[in-house]
Amino acid sequence: MNLIISTMLLILTNQYSIETPNYKLVKKYKNFEIRDYEEMIVAHTKIKRTFRESNSTGFRRIANYIFGGNDKSMEIAMTAPVLTKFPSDINSNIFEVSFVMPKEHNLKSLPSPDLETVSISERQLGRVAVFKFGGWATENRTKYYIDQLINSLKKERIDAVGDIMVAQYNSPWVMPPFRKNEIIIAIK
């Protein structure tokens, strides 16, 4: 029993020690919050598959990059969250998976990826609405929470204007009750 409790505490404390992007909390609503994100650098890749397959393939491609699959064989610290951008065309199935690079790096200090399918670029999320949820971020659950956030924005007369992403903060072995995910939508 002590081993189980110790393991759970280790998992929970580890998930909060991973670097995450900086943002300013603008306003908190009942079901969501508004944030202003600072510019960040991301490693990203596009995948034309299902949501689940895209997350898996995208994760592996970028993990290859940060674990030394680059022109300097340099290892780069893992950060959170892993971002999956939904296709802007509802009939498309091209997802973009991104890892945020540690703040200590800039575009010049980061090595070039070995894989041509991985790119490094600056990303400006800007002002976004964020809806938090736990459990597994499956495609059905994610779409459900996207709808929840869009409906909440409409009630508050806030216009969604850009990309829709799901942010997953935890490693795969974190149990569903302890998982942290967010739906992120760019707003005016």
Language model segments and positions:
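A solvent-exposed interaction/effector surface
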Residues: N2-K188
